[in-house]
Regions:
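Basic, Lys/Arg-rich alpha-helical nucleic-acid-recognition elements, primarily the DNA-binding modules
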Residues: 1-23
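General helical secondary-structure elements
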Residues: 2-3, 14-16, 30, 35-38, ...
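Non-membrane alpha-helical secondary structure
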Residues: 9, 13, 24-29, 76, ...
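Short linear sequence motifs
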Residues: 10, 14, 36-37, 121, ...
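Short gly/ser-rich loop at a beta-strand->alpha-helix junction or flexible surface loop bordering the NTP-binding
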Residues: 26-60
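Alpha-helical interaction segments
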Residues: 33-34, 118, 158-159
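Mid-protein regulatory/catalytic core that forms ligand/cofactor-binding pockets
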Residues: 46-141
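Charge-dense, extended regions
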Residues: 124-177
């Protein structure tokens, strides 16, 4: 299976983030996806099986996990990209850390696309606009490479208020205990 970089027409590079993730016991996309589910991406729990040892947020912060899932050097996986979008929207993420990682990892275009989708569905969430202010607009990701933006949200057809589409960004649930 080709990598996301290959689908984007980019060359792969030696990734410091990928090396850090591998050193933390996360050698591939599947292990990153398992960790995302363990860290609260329960919406995707049927996507992966098994568990992985969580190296801890001090060693692998949620920002690293998000950018890792959206990183272009791994095997291409729409499910990993959807989980990466969810982890990117984690409530306590620092946009400055995400921006630094995006630059360092050549993930700016992908993260910009996700942030644009986030702003479309959550126009008052400051995190998305902070990302967009800090990311260069160097062209679009080709259509069909990333999941459709509606795959990053949960949509309802009928609510207590009646019929109508209500969208909510899928993000990790707060874990207690």
């Amino acid at each position: 299976m080709p990598s996301l970089f290959r689908r984007l027409g980019m060359t792969s590079h030696v990734s410091p983030l990928r090396r850090r993730l591998q050193a933390a016991g996360l050698p591939d996309t599947q292990s990153l996806m398992r960790l995302a589910v363990q860290r609260g991406c329960r919406y995707y729990r049927d996507t992966v099986t098994g568990t992985v040892v969580d190296p801890g947020k001090d060693r692998v912060p949620d920002e690293d996990l998000a950018v890792g899932l959206l990183h272009g050097s791994w095997e291409y996986s729409p499910a990993a990209l959807r989980m990466g979008a969810a982890m990117l929207g984690a409530r306590d993420n620092d946009p400055r850390k995400v921006l630094r990682l995006a630059r360092m990892e050549r993930a700016e275009a992908v993260i910009r696309e996700v942030a644009e989708a986030g702003l479309r569905f959550e126009p008052t969430h400051r995190f998305w606009s902070c990302l967009l202010e800090g990311l260069p607009d160097r062209g679009r990701v080709p259509t069909g490479v990333l999941p459709h933006p509606t795959r990053f949200v949960a949509m309802t057809g009928i609510t207590r208020e009646g019929r109508g589409i209500r969208s909510q960004w899928i993000r990790p649930e707060e874990l207690h205990g």
